[in-house]
Amino acid sequence: MALHLRSSFSSKSTLLNILRHNLGFGSRSHVTRHIRQILPHDPPLRGSQNPISRLCNTMAEPETLSSFVQHEYANNHQVMDFPGGKVAFTPEIQFISESDKERVPCYRVLDDNGQLITNSQFVQVSEEVAVKIYSDMVTLQIMDNIFYEAQRQGRLSFYATAIGEEAINIASAAALTPQDVIFPQYREPGVLLWRGFTLQEFANQCFGNKSDYGKGRQMPVHYGSNKLNYFTVSATIATQLPNAVGAAYSLKMDKKDACAVTYFGDGGTSEGDFHAALNIAAVMEAPVLFICRNNGWAISTPTSDQFRSDGVVVKGRAYGIRSIRVDGNDALAMYSAVHTAREMAIREQRPILIEALTYRVGHHSTSDDSTRYRSAGEIEWWNKARNPLSRFRTWIESNGWWSDKTESDLRSRIKKEMLEALRVAEKTEKPNLQNMFSDVYDVPPSNLREQELLVRQTINSHPQDYPSDVPL
C-alpha cells in the first residue's frame, strides 16, 4: 500500500482526499459517513461538531494519521476466500439491480428491407450455401402450408408449422456440421431438411405409415433420424436440454471436433430442465449450444407473463454462460452467430446461449386458434415487415445469385414433389399392430404379451371402434 501523506494537513478537505485515496471510498461523503461510525460516541467538544474536525483534533501528528489509514485500509481490503474465487467486502448495503438500465442489444446484419447494414460483422457465405439456405427456407414454408391444409382436410391427425421462424431453422443448421448432434423441439424440421431428410421421409412420419422410422408410434412433426444425428422430438417441453448437455460432455470426453445443439422456445425457459441444463453445462464446461427461439408466445402465454428479466439472454450470464441475442428473422445474422458460437464452444470447451428474437406467425398448432389471444393485424405486420424469406431473398438477389424465374421454378418443383410425397405416404400401409409392443425388450415379458393379446381381443370384439387400415 502506498500512503500519500503530507507532513501535516491544514484543512478538512486535505484529510478527506487522503482518506478517500488510500481507503478506496467512492466519494468524500462515503468517507464522512464511515468516520461517523468509527469515532467514539462521547459528546464532541464545542466547535467541533463536524466529524472531520473531530478527527483532525485527534491526529496532530502524521504518524497518527498513517497508523489510522493503515488500520482502516486493512479493514476495507479484506476479502473472503470462497469456493469459486475471492469475494470483496463492502461497508454499504448494496443490492444488485434486477435489470440493467438498457436492454441487451440484438445482433443483426440485414435491415428489415434486406439491405446490408453498414460496418456489420458477419461470416462470409458462399453463393452455394446462400442459395441452399434460401431454397430450404422456401421448401420448409411450402411443406408447412401443404401439411397444415392436409390436417384441416382430416388427412393428418396433427401438425405444427415453423412459419415465420424459417431463418432460425435453416441458417443455424447451415452453420453446423453433420457431426454435431441435434436435440430439437417440435419446431425445427428445417434443421433436418438441411441435413438431407427428404420430403417423402417427412410425409411418412406425419402419416405414421410402415416406412416411418418411428413405426407410427409418434405424433406428426415429432421427427427423428439416427443417420442424421437428429434425436427424436419429445413432446414434453425442455426435456431435450439436459440430454444435450450429456451428449456434449460425451463429445468432450471423446475429444471430438463437434458439439451438441439443442433448440427450445421461450416457454421452455419456464421449465426446471432449462435451469438444470444451463447450470450443469457451465459447471462441466460442456460444448453445447442452447438456441432459444423467443417467438413471443408460449402457446397463448406472452413473454410478459412468463418472466420479468430482459428476455432469455440474461439468464445465461446468471449461470456463467457466454450469451448473445440475435435477430432470428435475419438469416445472415443467425448463420454468423451460430457459426461463431460453434467454433467458440469447441475451441474453448464451453456452453453458449443464443437467444433468437422472432415471431410465431402460425398458430401454435392445429389444435390452436391464436386469433383468440392476439390480433390478426399483429400477425400480418410481422409476416410482412420482418419476413425472413423476403429479407434474405433481397440480399441474394443483390449479389446476382437469384431471380424471379429461379424463384418460380423452385416453388413449382417443390409443390409438385410435396404433393406426390403426400399421395405416396397416405397410400402406404400402416405398421403392424405388433409394433406397439416391440423394440423395448429383446424378449418381451409375459405381462407385455398379455397386453398385446388383450388389445387384439378388444379390437376383434369392437372392430367399429378402431382403424380398419392397421394390420393385425
Swiss-Prot record:
CDD domains noted in UniProt: TPP_E1_PDC_ADC_BCADC
InterPro entries: Alpha-ketoacid_DH_E1_comp, DH_E1, THDP-binding
Pfam families for this protein: E1_dh
Cofactor(s) for this UniProt protein: thiamine diphosphate
Protein residues bound to thiamine diphosphate: Q185, Y186, R187
Organism superkingdom: Eukaryota
Binding residue positions for K(+): S234, T239, Q240
GO BP terms, alphabetized: branched-chain amino acid catabolic process
Class of this enzyme: oxidoreductase
Catalytic activity: N(6)-[(R)-lipoyl]-L-lysyl-[protein] + 3-methyl-2-oxobutanoate + H(+) = N(6)-[(R)-S(8)-2-methylpropanoyldihydrolipoyl]-L-lysyl-[protein] + CO2
Single GO MF descriptor: metal ion binding
Enzyme Commission number, as recorded: 1.2.4.4
Main subcellular location of this protein, as a coarse class: mitochondrion
UniProt keyword terms in alphabetical order: Metal-binding, Mitochondrion, Oxidoreductase, Potassium, Thiamine pyrophosphate, Transit peptide
Compartment(s): Mitochondrion matrix
Record GO cellular component, one term: mitochondrial matrix
Function noted in UniProt: The branched-chain alpha-keto dehydrogenase complex catalyzes the overall conversion of alpha-keto acids to acyl-CoA and CO(2). It contains multiple copies of three enzymatic components: branched-chain alpha-keto acid decarboxylase (E1), lipoamide acyltransferase (E2) and lipoamide dehydrogenase (E3).
Subunit field text: Heterotetramer of alpha and beta chains.
Further comment found in the protein's record: Bound potassium ions stabilize the protein structure.
Family the entry assigns: Belongs to the BCKDHA family.
Name of this protein: 2-oxoisovalerate dehydrogenase subunit alpha 2, mitochondrial
Origin species: Arabidopsis thaliana
